[in-house]
Design a protein with these regions (language model features):
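N-terminal prosegments of processed precursors
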Residues: 2-142
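Propeptide-to-catalytic entry region of secreted or membrane-anchored zinc metalloproteases
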Residues: 50, 68, 86-292, 310-334, ...
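Short beta-strand elements
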Residues: 166-178, 537-568
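The catalytic-center signature of Zn2+-dependent metalloproteases
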Residues: 311-398
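Low-complexity, acidic Ser/Thr/Pro/Gly-rich terminal tails and inter-domain linkers that flank the onset
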Residues: 414-439
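Contiguous segments within soluble domain cores/interaction surfaces
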Residues: 452-516, 524-530, 600-609
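Compositionally biased low-complexity segments at domain edges in trafficked proteins
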Residues: 552-602
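Flexible helix-coil transition and linker loops at the boundaries of alpha-helical arrays
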Residues: 589-606, 643-661, 694-702
Length: 721
């Protein structure tokens, strides 16, 4: 009777009329996490069993740890005064260090005498050449309401027992994660969503779903902490638009569990809009965490954000025509970005099993190839697909855990070697840039996409790696290959569609100087760079660009290189600005510009550009006052912005610039904006005149050239008044 009372708690999940007489047939599932963590165990195994329950993948995986005992008793040999070093200071203590992870991809399953035996060959992620180790796991089968039993796990090498474990079951899930969410005043935490909203699959169960349930359904025990509401006491408008630099600093300052180490804690933030500095209506989500390559730096994938106003503003027929449907898109977008924090790529960007027709969170509804945006929602089951489940549940710990590696997939040599054949297609991709740089100089890539056909062609004007349509692959001087991974990843709507006439091109300028792994070109030698527009399976590829990084430079240049690779300086230059915590960096950069202006104009003008963008915009930070977290705004400094931007442009008096044409055009436009706000029409006129002279022969900046001509006419009207 006691068990039947417990069974009644499952009403709605089980047919009680059918099962109350068959309760003795119900066995507890064996999938979940098992771990030995007793103090006497020197070797610790965290074992994940995934063979039954919800969407089983028939896989075993594990993480191995080692417990070390440290005894500081040797300090007694120094006869220290007891007052300085009392005996209690010499008590031994232990530390636990992670060692490696493994996976068993083919599992043999058998059950006898109510014990299930699981066995298979082990593959270590960090050493796949090891092929002679196997594991045997035995798990007693117990009734549904009985406590979960311990399992035994034995690892064999070449058939000889190597290690044995007795593992208590610690969770029904495969990972345990804590998500902390902050939101800006006026936005909302993701709402519970009715899964039956039209359109949706006909066979979905009735009820609602939220962020925690999405990930628990995927086997991840997600705890959601809806934490702080960020207030703006200064203005009803200032906090609406957030740059990536502001988001990153918000994470560092406001994430309660922020730390420079691997952890199963992650930070999400909801703001109205993204923009740097102008609002981008098609920019819905971002994973903005900067990568770490030096001690003390932020580790990867600890923070993400969504822009609620922008997401809710999406329009597509009747798909988002009421609040409930807009809530659905917000939740899907939020879970998509959290998926990126787990290191999940887009469904169509995987190096293995890529699938643009996946009805997973990691697809874009508007990129769904099996029925378009409406078809996506008709098929969407609020699930990750099997490849993604395997990754989150069983991927290499360092690849999945927040603060860990940035995954780049399989062998990349095919993406940087010679073109396999001449491409036939309507679009051509070209890249260009300096072929010789010194270690402290920035590496700027000019990208051009051209319609080479005789008919008009539709293309997306997304030529920045952060937007994840353009991908860059680099062959290193030692022959190894890597994919360039920008510190920021953006989730963008399918806007910016351009209709290219025959022979027409779109252009952009890409700064490759810094990646998630640090300086992209940190070693002297020859590199080869190639770009892809699309994905690895179906992409327009560019030719290969040779780049040589000089190995001959002076001590003074080496000092400059060391400074520019410092973590705080690198962050400031990538984001082109920062809050008050970067005041020291700003001062150092100003001094560097003054010192090297004549001898190193190439780098100085890039530094002046970053300083100019920094001075030109307001910057939001969060201050804790009492129990409230209030937004504080550091106002722009337009006069300093004009000075820095003028220097970056070679000054408005005719001095030469070293900036590429596109970067020059964008910087000139920003300088004009600042001058107009300040009412400095004389500098504005000189800037527009120089921009017209500089850009008149550049096809890539034709639109900018025409814009400057119009603006110059308007400025001259102002100066005559």
């Amino acid at each position: 009777m006691e068990n039947l009372k417990k069974l009644e708690l499952l009403e709605g999940l089980l047919d009680l009329d059918r099962f109350q007489h068959l309760e003795f047939l119900l066995y507890r599932r064996i999938s979940g996490t098992y771990k030995n963590n007793k103090t006497h165990s020197s070797s610790i195994l965290e074992l994940r069993v995934d063979v039954d329950g919800r969407r089983p993948q028939r896989i075993l995986s594990g993480d191995l740890f080692r417990r070390f005992t440290i005894d500081l008793g040797f300090w007694h040999n120094f006869n220290l005064d007891a007052a300085i070093a009392p005996a209690s200071h010499f008590s031994p203590f232990t530390i636990v260090l992670y060692q490696r992870s493994f996976i068993v991809e083919t599992v043999d399953i058998s059950t006898s005498n109510e014990v299930t035996t699981l066995s298979g060959a082990i593959r270590y992620y960090d050493d796949p050449a090891v092929n002679d180790e196997t594991i045997v796991v035995e798990i007693p089968r117990v009734r549904f309401f009985q406590p979960a039993p311990e399992c035994s796990a034995k690892i064999y090498k070449a058939g000889i027992l190597k290690s044995a474990y007795c593992l208590p079951k610690i969770s029904e899930y495969f990972r345990s994660v804590h998500l902390e969410i902050d939101r800006y005043e006026g936005t909302s935490f993701p709402e519970d969503v009715d899964m039956g909203l039209d359109p949706s699959p006909d066979d979905l169960p009735a009820g609602t779903i939220d962020t925690a349930r999405v990930f628990r359904n995927a086997g991840i025990d997600l705890t959601v902490q809806e934490d702080d509401v960020l207030n703006d006491p200064d203005s009803p408008d200032v906090g609406n638009n957030w740059s990536e630099a502001e988001l990153h600093q918000l994470m560092e300052d406001n994430f309660d569990r922020f730390g420079n180490y691997l952890q199963w804690n992650v930070y999400g933030v909801i703001v109205p809009r993204f923009g740097d500095p102008n609002y981008n209506a098609g920019y819905y989500g971002t994973m903005f965490d900067w990568g770490g390559w030096q001690a003390g730096d932020t580790f990867l994938r600890q923070g993400f954000a969504i822009a609620e106003d922008a997401t809710r503003a999406r329009s597509s027929g009747s798909l988002y025509n009421n609040d409930a449907k807009r809530d659905r898109l917000v939740l899907q977008t939020f879970c998509h970005e959290l998926g990126h924090a787990f290191n999940l790529p887009h469904a169509w960007q995987r190096s293995v099993d890529d699938n643009p027709a996946s009805n997973s969170f990691m697809n874009y509804p508007w990129r769904y190839t099996d029925g378009g945006e409406s078809g996506f929602w008709e098929d969407f089951r609020w699930e990750f697909d099997d490849s993604e489940l395997v990754w989150m549940r069983h991927g290499n710990r360092r690849d999945v855990i927040f603060g860990g590696n940035d995954w780049i997939g399989n062998n990349l040599s095919i993406f940087t070697g010679p073109m396999p054949e001449v491409q036939e297609g309507p679009l051509a991709l070209q890249i260009d840039g300096n072929e010789f740089v010194r270690p402290f100089e920035p590496v700027i890539l000019q990208v051009k996409l051209t319609n080479t056909s005789a008919q008009n062609q539709i293309a997306l004007d997304r030529l920045q790696p952060e937007d994840q349509l353009l991908q860059i692959y680099i062959e290193q001087p030692d022959g190894s290959h890597r994919r360039y991974m920008p510190p920021v990843k953006r989730l963008l709507a399918p806007g910016d569609v351009v209709n290219l006439a025959p022979g027409e091109s779109i252009y952009d300028s890409v700064n490759l100087t810094y990646s998630t792994a640090g300086p992209t070109f940190s070693e002297p030698g020859e590199y080869r760079i190639r770009a892809y527009y699309g994905n690895e399976e179906a992409a327009v590829m560019s030719g290969s660009l040779r780049l040589r990084v000089s190995s001959h430079y002076s001590l003074e240049e080496e000092k400059l290189t060391h400074f520019l690779r410092r973590v705080d300086v690198a962050k400031f230059l990538y984001y082109r600005g920062g809050g008050p915590k970067y005041d020291g960096v700003v001062q150092e950069l100003e001094e560097i510009c003054g010192k090297y202006e004549k001898n190193q104009p190439e780098i100085v003008q890039q530094l002046q550009l970053a300083l100019g963008v920094h001075y030109a915009r307001d910057f939001k930070t969060v201050k804790v006052i009492g129990k409230k977290r209030l937004i504080s705004v550091v106002k722009a400094e337009p006069k300093k912005a004009i000075k820095a931007l003028s220097g970056a442009l070679g000054s408005a008096k005719g001095k030469a610039t070293t900036l590429d044409a596109l970067t020059f055009a964008k910087a000139s436009g920003l300088l004009l904006d600042v001058c107009e706000k300040l009412g400095d029409w004389k500098t504005a006129e000189l800037t527009a005149e120089k921009a017209i002279r500089q850009l008149q022969d550049h096809e890539s900046t034709k639109a900018h050239f025409n814009s400057f001509k119009k603006r110059l006419t308007q400025i001259r009207k102002k100066t005559k008044k």
